[in-house]
Amino acid sequence: YVEFIYHRYEFAEYNFYGGLICAMAFEKKLSPAMPYLKKLKVHLKKLKLWAGNCPENFEPLYLLLQAELARISGSPGNTATLYEKAIQSADKYLFINIKGLANELAGRFHFQSANAIIAKTYLDNARHAYLQWGAILKVKYLEKEFGSVLGKSILEETSENTVTGSLQNADMNLVLETSNAINNAKDIDRVIEKLMQIV
């Protein structure tokens, strides 16, 4: 089916996610590993062409896949730089899902390199991006996997803030209803009756 989608955005996504899968398969040493590296480079080459023609749509994908190639090739300095570029590009072009993924992969990279403090920063940024994107289950998964690094759940904080905000809105609505009841009433008995209904 791939030959029918060459000129569609889905083909770029196919190459991006296909490249990520190849990087993971190569890292896990699924046999034989070398074809995965070769396929990753083919996917990357296609994304490079598209990123050159339309960076708004493809640059974040290309940079993130480039970072993954650098990671599995054993180039830690280049890997960290490319992750950062991918995050900045995703932020610039409003790819919140790719921003979350780039932060997550950068966090995993630093965690595996025993840089827990740096990993925490990236993983926390990933949580926020995923939450902004609406990927609640992904946030829960990250918090379960990296609970020792991330600490308190961001979902609990969000829930507490939502309850507090809801109570503040309810208080403001009560004040407005009371004010309207007093302003619109001509009879004190009706004002008292209306206030009792509001309460």
Language model segments and positions:
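Phosphate-binding active sites in nucleotide-utilizing proteins
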Residues: 194
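Amphipathic alpha-helical protein-protein interaction surfaces
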Residues: 115, 135, 184-187
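Signal-transmission linkers at sensory-effector interfaces
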Residues: 147-190
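Helix-coil-helix junctions within alpha-helical repeat/solenoid scaffolds
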Residues: 1-131, 138-150
